């Protein structure tokens, strides 16, 4: 994995203050675009039941001996000089969120192996979120996967950051393209939470409905990445229920397919549509979205079949008509190109 140059703790930095500041700026400016070059969620992250392991995303260096001055303790003392920040930027660990939405700079490493998960109650010190964002300031208790705080502007980002942290960890959140931190977090403690297999069926269904609702809100707000994350969480909960499972699974797979198409992953979208059509062969949205996915993959014959199935039930479906027309034109171009190639071969 590509990493940015990070100086060891035991190497004395003799650079002038201005040079150290420039070095620190360069570290974040070069590190952040590393993840930003891959827009959208990683394909693996969009598969149901597969989540990127945050432990694999961290660039490990030697353990930090001293936290950034002012973060530990009274929030009124939260003042760090530019030179101090520059030195710590060079020595800190950087963790890249798998979907490219932020970079976490670890100031004080946590301890233990456990991290918060669904249902974990986290004691958090949050500082620096923009005024009016609705995010908590100071000490607060947040529950992973539950609560209106997740619906705020920075709620999803904060939740993803907490899910990557260990007990006692202090970190700063940086947005792509910015060396100035958005906010600072300290995860003081958290309860264990529970894995899905430990929950009752009714509890799983209730949590899945909450994730479904949140995903739909994010999708309508133009955030297919966040929506896909919520739909995936809901499906992982429902997939642990005895078959055939609740009918909501069908809608979740169809919605997930829409997100995957917008994020440029037609293969995954086609697979999600297959799951829908296994349960409801006449599901028009799944047929249409699978047709779009197959067309993007170059499987024009199967794409045509899907669009024709939609039009057989709904002859006035304008979107299906338009996509079918595009597929027909694309097929004619392919046939013409093949004919030209054959003529050259036998001329």
From Swiss-Prot:
Residues 1-24 are annotated as: Disordered. PROSITE patterns: TPR (PS50005), TPR_REGION (PS50293). Gene3D superfamilies: Tetratricopeptide repeat domain. One of its GO terms (cellular component) is extracellular region. InterPro entries: FKBP4/5/8-like, TPR-like_helical_dom_sf, TPR_rpt. One of its GO terms (biological process) is regulation of blood vessel branching. Keywords: Phosphoprotein, Repeat, TPR repeat. SUPFAM superfamilies: FKBP-like, TPR-like. TPR repeats lie at residues 208-241, 250-283, 284-317. Disulfide bonds: none annotated. The modification Phosphothreonine is found at residue 3. May be involved in response to X-ray. Regulates p21 protein stability by binding to Hsp90 and p21. PANTHER family: FK506-BINDING PROTEIN-LIKE, PEPTIDYLPROLYL ISOMERASE. Forms a ternary complex with CDKN1A/p21 and HSP90AB1/Hsp90. This is FK506-binding protein-like. It comes from Mus musculus (Mouse).
